[in-house]
């Protein structure tokens, strides 16, 4: 809070009864707030992280053959490059990636065989504030995204702009504001506001979504109510030190396309489990539409080689997909010795 000397013309803004009353009320509110023992509830993007990112394998599935070769040149700061070769559905035949990271900076670039370039650059201003940028050129989907994130003692807030522009004589793009507040040591409530306009010939669209997250000792439950009428709920539980399971349910209600009108209901429920062996990780899931998927990651002893096997079977369409990948992480002996005694970096991913 700014301070002014008694001789400053602006001192009257501070030396008055109204300012003193507001300052005392704010300080009392902050002290009362600390007594609740609240902690940071995370962010809106990671509200169902344990289920959707850690347990379920939807984000890990692929079909075909893939080989990844990663070479690390430095650990502090982190600098590595990777080459990916692939044959399969929705996989680029070749992609090159470079990554650089410190406690303050994260930079990553990807270039595929068709010339599509995507970059990410994050900068940490302090322990709680990060600015994130993303750019992609080529592939028919040019995109620019800017995000500023702040993590407080008991809340998180972020502002995001996707393809913002004034070139058409007015503001266009997508703008998103997130806020998640811990209301008890276990419960967090939040909302997300979206404002978007594709062109000046169209009016802007606005939407508000609501979020809730409850975290107990060994289980987490979350709920998301989207502005379009979709409801997503998830439940995650840690069964043992090596086994965790989760269920994710999505229900949406939309106007019917038929002549009679009315509403149509669509929903899907997915159950998944993850088991961590000593040298491998196994994930499996099945959904209410009859699709069974599994993924096995196997590390080959002390060698920096990981084999991944993926498979899914759709019992309704009678279709099956298989995938296999080999990942090799190459580094010099000196880097391996440095890794044993080096402190881990807190990179702002």
From Swiss-Prot:
Pfam families attached to this UniProt entry: Porin_3
Entry's localization field: Mitochondrion outer membrane
Protein's membrane topology: Multi-pass membrane protein
GO MF annotation, one: porin activity
Keywords noted in UniProt: Ion transport, Membrane, Mitochondrion, Mitochondrion outer membrane, Porin, Protein transport, Transmembrane, Transmembrane beta strand, Transport
InterPro entries: Porin_dom_sf, Porin_Euk/Tom40, Tom40, Tom40_fungi
Domain of life per record: Eukaryota
GO terms, biological process: monoatomic ion transport; protein import into mitochondrial matrix; protein insertion into mitochondrial outer membrane
SS bond list: none
Main localization (coarse): mitochondrion
GO CC entries: mitochondrial outer membrane translocase complex; pore complex
Protein's job: Channel-forming protein essential for import of protein precursors into mitochondria.
Family under the similarity heading: Belongs to the Tom40 family.
Oligomer and partners: Forms part of the preprotein translocase complex of the outer mitochondrial membrane (TOM complex) which consists of at least 8 different proteins (tom5, tom6, tom7, tom20, tom22, tom37, tom40 and tom70). Interacts with mitochondrial targeting sequences.
NCBIfam families: 3a0801s07tom40
Name of protein: Mitochondrial import receptor subunit tom40
Gene transcribed to yield this protein: tom40
